Amino acid sequence: MNKKILFIPLVLFLLLAAALLWQFNRNADGDDPTLLESALVGKPVPVFKLESLQNPGQLYSQKALINGKPLLLNVWATWCPTCRAEHEYLNTLAEKGVRVVGLNYKDNRVKAINWLNTLGNPYALSLYDGDGMLGLDLGVYGAPETFLIDGKGIIRYRHAGDLNAEVWKDEVQPLWNKYSKLAED
């Protein structure tokens, strides 16, 4: 009887070790929440009414995003170190004619304006989402996140994390080219 009681902690330990090992393997092979496709891909941009970042009181709705041509909606904040890392590349894309709309997310308006004045402003339009409601409606995990929106206001792609030259070339640019061509037809 005593021998059986001694084996109970060993069995419990082995079960716990097996569960931990399973969880580590599960996370290592692709259960990364940033890789989840947005539930909004293929659907219109959520209805919103937000102020301009630089001009409080000047309101914009989702209709401001629709002009027949695709755009990138970039969710960013000054408290986000990865946003700083991607900012220079966003400036480069804007210089190449890519329409980028900024969504300043849960941030301090004054700090955000100073950031753009210091680092450059790649945004054709800057929206202020101080309470994060549009971010919530978009299913944003955090900043940065970038959405490709076609000329009709339909979300076609979501990227969580740094939008850099490699991500642009491999993932976003082919879709950008596709929806730009459709806008021309």
From Swiss-Prot:
Segments on the Cytoplasmic face: 1-4
Record gene name: dsbE
InterPro entries: Periplasmic_diS_OxRdtase_DsbE, Redoxin, Thioredoxin-like_sf, Thioredoxin_CS, Thioredoxin_domain, Thioredoxin_ResA/DsbE_sf
Membrane topology of the entry: Single-pass membrane protein
Organism: Tatumella citrea (Pantoea citrea)
Keyword match Disulfide bond: yes
Name used for this protein in its record: Thiol:disulfide interchange protein DsbE
Occurrences of domain Thioredoxin (ranges): 39-177
Family: Belongs to the thioredoxin family. DsbE subfamily.
